[in-house]
Amino acid sequence: ASDVYKRQNITRRVTQATAGDDVHGLVLLVQFSDKKFSSVGTQQAFDEMMNKEGYDYMGAIGSARDYFISQSGGLFQPTFDVVGPITLDNTMAYYGANDYSGQDVRPDEMVIDACKKAESMVDFTIYDRDNDGFVDLVYVIYAGYGESSDIDGSLEDAIWPHAWYIYQGAQKRVSVDGKYLDAYACSAELLGNSGTTRDGIGTFCHEYSHTLGLPDFYDTSGVTSNYGMGTWSLMDYGCYNGPDSDGDGYSDGSVPVGYTAYEREFCGWITIEELTTPSSVTLENLADSKKAYKIVSSDKDQYFTLENRQQTGWDRYMASAGLMIVKVDYDQSVWDYNTVNNESSRQRMTIMPADNKYSEYNEDGDLYPYNGNTSFTDDSRPAAKTNTGLKLGKPVTNIEQDNGVITFDFMGGIPAVVAPVADVATHVTTTGFPANW
């Protein structure tokens, strides 16, 4: 029953993704009895981070709202209502201490307690946009660092940024203003594990994207280290893209990578055109053209997407530019359980690197053309084969890049010829008429 319930929630979120500018997201600033926001953790600062056009803190190129407007081509224009700080009665460890399996013990209770305290300040009914009885989403930014930045065990009591459901966590129904709480996401105030630099928008955009239905594309098992999508996807390590503004040797997540073609189509923002017949293809930058292609195998759930990615805009901190080819091996249950790339022998959403090296340390060789590799065929390296060994039999050859424009031949590259369209005949006589086109 819980899995069905989860899919229903995801359906609601995807509907929200195409809601234009009629979306308000609730963001609660939450601090604990023993951990308060730093001096930079003010309501105004986070409101700007969420909503200010052209937000530029620590090298950012826009706010979270700017990011989603850009990725959706204006189809999704959320406004984030920032409330707080709200001080909870319990310590951070009460919510964030780890259980025997390494999971936070009560993060869902943090959300419940925060909403209860915010009830006098917030009209939760306006956040049930589809009027289904559930608050669409509660987002919490909590004081301090996230456990995901822990490198020495000092942050074990902190909360790990994540997206989840109240009912699945607390196993109970909780309501505010007559609306049930359920979908929530959370992330930390501060970047890294020291200093007072606010976290970039990347983590927020990543976690908020879960509420639009997208799963993680990194290995969520914590056991293996499969490559997945690396920094090429917001739903992997691309959420950390950006400059090293504080000089600690790490990017700060202030300029997260743009959505992939798959992610845009998943949210209903574009339609990826299938290549089926021989043609010579010209492909402009995805960020500008909203155009991408896919090549589908005999198993319709296994296919490859092709998109032109350039180092401009939100993609400016990518490792390289060119044609990005991504293998998709869709299984709804795997997506629902958020285990897309946990199986080493069957990663289901992963880049096909032009240099044939599946590693975050070689990402500058991932996009085509690279070092003489200008083809993606049944016999190329990497090969155009599905996870189950199906050969596409639909070669992509002669991949070139010129001035940010990608061209390639599909199945031999016969140019498309558009037949002339005849106009309606005029001056018709009993013996004939002049042809017009």
Would you name each region that the model predicts?
Residues 38-89, 150-194, 264-415:
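Non-catalytic C-terminal accessory/binding modules of secreted extracellular proteins
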